[in-house]
């Protein structure tokens, strides 16, 4: 089983950026669609229809969808080594009357008649430059959180209170899944954005239902509800039932113990690796992050430019070393530049830069890694040979798995990428092993990933 192009899109380390205010309106980023009060998608569409009528409103929205992000933007991203984008959308974005029936968006269904068609054209456009696309349900039924970016300004998160809302969101996920199968550059579907904290049982049930309607090859990205470690453990415990990826958002300007800390202290804390060291090799991405700090933080330094660069570099080091990738929030703003929220600003100011892939001249397994393999294999055999077992072991599968990890690591590099989700890749590889001892192959691969990580091979900034 070789590495195909779809595998490369899905399993590589994601150097990403969010395309905010495109299919899910956010006034502070782009106010083109707004004619009255409010800042959410619902207020944008209702105001536009009220001011211009349904047909002209549809023209306005379609003009925005077609022009906000174009091939020149994808070219800019590729030039700056972006290989994936995260596109926020809502259940209203799918151009399906049944999906908006009985919702606040039902009166405006005609505005969204062609939205999915345009979205698919843009997915294809991104694919022409080898950029992957993560489709993110910012807007779910009832609201996944109390913020306007969930689609309305109701201030309510009622998704968790009604089974109907959860089931309808699953139907929306299923419908979207049925429309994107032809695009090899779709890297996943995120089924909810920033769910509120504490809804563990509701979310676990919802995530499993959503997983069941998404094609097995495609990851289901899940919001962590501000409890990263809980959902990383949950995904690790459920990896045999399908490919999940935890979406964690990392901001230092909205709250938490570091919200008002000096930039130097925040950077030092990041550099310790305390926050993400426990998640290494797990299926997790930083779905949103920025270089924004509070005014109180910035007031505590006179070295603004240096601290800004140090902060950006420290974040990238953590997110790309310990996670499967990250997506900066957000790509651009309608009116000028958006400061430390603006990808173009921080790239052009050299605050952050995604790293080029490491060289691939040396394809032979390093002697130190071979030594680790042989030592681990000996320990593996000794341990399991002392145990009662119902069938003969196949210890050679352990070595086969270890060697396969190295070969796959090199193959990703040869395609200009680093592997981002090694545990999930191991699960995929296991499907080719028809043996009751396939677990030995799995353990060999995962042990190899662990040692590759320890030696720095999985860190794009500190690669040997």
Curated annotation (Swiss-Prot):
One of its GO terms (cellular component) is cytoplasm. One of its GO terms (molecular function) is glucan endo-1,6-beta-glucosidase activity. The gene is exg3. Its EC number is 3.2.1.58. InterPro entries: Glycoside_hydrolase_SF, Glycosyl_hydrolase_5. It catalyses: Successive hydrolysis of beta-D-glucose units from the non-reducing ends of (1->3)-beta-D-glucans, releasing alpha-glucose. Keywords: Cell wall biogenesis/degradation, Glycosidase, Hydrolase. SUPFAM superfamilies: (Trans)glycosidases. PROSITE patterns: GLYCOSYL_HYDROL_F5. PANTHER family: GLUCAN 1,3-BETA-GLUCOSIDASE 3, GLUCAN ENDO-1,6-BETA-GLUCOSIDASE B. The keyword Hydrolase applies. One of its GO terms (biological process) is glucan catabolic process. Belongs to the glycosyl hydrolase 5 (cellulase A) family. This is Glucan 1,3-beta-glucosidase 3. It comes from the Eukaryota.
